[in-house]
Design a protein with these regions (language model features):
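His/Met- and acidic-residue-enriched segments that coordinate or traffic transition-metal cofactors
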Residues: 2-6, 19-186
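N-terminal signal peptide c-region/cleavage motif recognized by signal peptidases
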Residues: 14-16
């Protein structure tokens, strides 16, 4: 009986670890500063680009002037990086599968944005953009330093400055929010 209890306890402890998603694995890798595998990197980048494009298309419809301007830049730039990544994969330089849809985490964020309006939309959108770009910069830095595919590693290094600029733009947009909100109330 005691062995059964111990075995059950071990399974209960191990189950969450076995059920980790790619994002959680790369989250742990991020904390440790470890480069993701090529397949994890490709998947995370593709999902990130899809999220950036879709959330920014919403901002083009629902956002204020500053959010719309930022969103237009994000749609342009992330469409470009998506096309480049697809070219690396389809050209055979990178052996990985590209996801065709958002994962559940990003889909729920997108659904939250779809439901928001006005200043609530702007606050959510801006917060999500800062967070997404911090994650992207970290992901690209780690792969550019320690990735195992030379072509993808080179691309990550070349793409990184644009992502760092996006992060700065998102942070500036976030800093401008309280001032814009106060100005709108007058």
């Amino acid at each position: 009986m005691r062995r059964i209890l111990i075995a059950t306890a071990c399974l209960m402890i191990a189950a969450p670890a076995l059920a980790q998603s790619v994002g959680e694995k790369t989250g742990v890798n991020s904390m440790l500063g470890v480069s993701p595998s090529t397949s994890d990197f490709v998947k995370e980048v593709a999902i990130s680009d899809m999220f950036e494009i879709e959330s920014s298309k919403l901002a083009q419809q629902k956002g204020n002037a500053a959010e719309k301007s930022f969103a237009s830049q994000m749609v342009t730039d992330h469409t470009k990086t998506s096309t480049e990544l697809k070219g690396l994969v389809s050209g055979g330089k990178v052996k990985a599968e590209l996801p065709t849809a958002l994962d559940s985490s990003h889909q729920s964020k997108l659904d939250k944005l779809k439901a928001a309006s006005g200043t609530d939309f702007g606050a959510e959108f801006t917060s999500m953009q800062v967070s997404a770009h911090k994650d992207a910069v970290d992901l690209f830095e780690r792969y550019a330093k320690g990735g195992d595919n030379p072509a993808l590693k080179d691309w990550a290094g070349k793409t990184l400055p644009a992502l760092q600029h996006h992060l700065q733009m998102a942070q500036d947009l976030d800093k401008a929010r309280p001032a814009a909100t106060i100005g709108e109330r007058r």
